[in-house]
Amino acid sequence: MKLVITRLAPYYFYNMSYSIYIRNLERTKSPINKNQVENWVDELINWLYDINQEYNNYRFFQNKEKLLQLKLQDILANVVDDTDQIIVNSNHFFDRLEQIHFVLINDLETIINFDPAAKSKEEVLIAYPGFFAITAYRIANVFWKLNIPIIPRIITEYVHSKTGIDIHPGAEIGEKFFIDHGTGIVIGETTKIGNNVKIYQGVTLGALSVSKDNASAKRHPTIENNVTIYANATILGGNTTIGVNSVIGGNVWLTHSVPENSLVYHKSEIEIKKKSEFPEALNYVI
């Protein structure tokens, strides 16, 4: 029996791998290089904030900008057919960078002013995953609004893989946005977030079950200005609005709107008793 299996195995694996090969061959493939996009994002962010402190000379700074623009055009050429449109899209993105940088500096200042653990701007720039995710989102959102395929999702999913923060590039997020810790945050495609909003780890701004036919409808909640959402809260639905100046407590589950100046919290009973009231179990095993 062992001899028969040995003889059949190469034929079996050949057929199995061939079927995989054929399915891959039949699938429409994008020519875009995922690693190329990710490397470009890292280079852009380093240049945007001079994280490695290597641009003491303005001419060097300008030259790097031109190089980044050429690299972007090379990336865009994989998903945009028209050469003139590639140049237009690239120019539009770099024309927007000054405004993007201004908005991001406001996000950075918000973290510094609100988070007592943040000791300096450099610490936030180098070590805070929340700010990294916000930066990548604001970059990806420009491409999303230009209707450029694939690239916006590659950017945000790259950051998702590094930080655990999942922000769809199509979401609308206002200024002075603050993410604390960040792990497990999900912000869906049609989410609208106002200014001065603070979100903690594990928060989901998601959709209720929607058919594919209604994919273009607003499926995710609206968070108005000056709202704080604490850890592991879940807010679902395109008709759900959290009013101005509201606070959503940890572990809250919401599928309906909340008026302005609301405090929403999950109420559960916690009892504290003396250990002596509970005899130690003889069969307790870890």
What are these regions (language model features)?
Residues 255-258, 276-277, 284-286:
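C-terminal functional extensions of proteins
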Residues 1-157, 279-286:
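Terminal amphipathic alpha-helical/low-complexity segments used for targeting or macromolecular assembly
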Residues 163, 168-169, 174-175, 180-189, ...:
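Left-handed beta-helix
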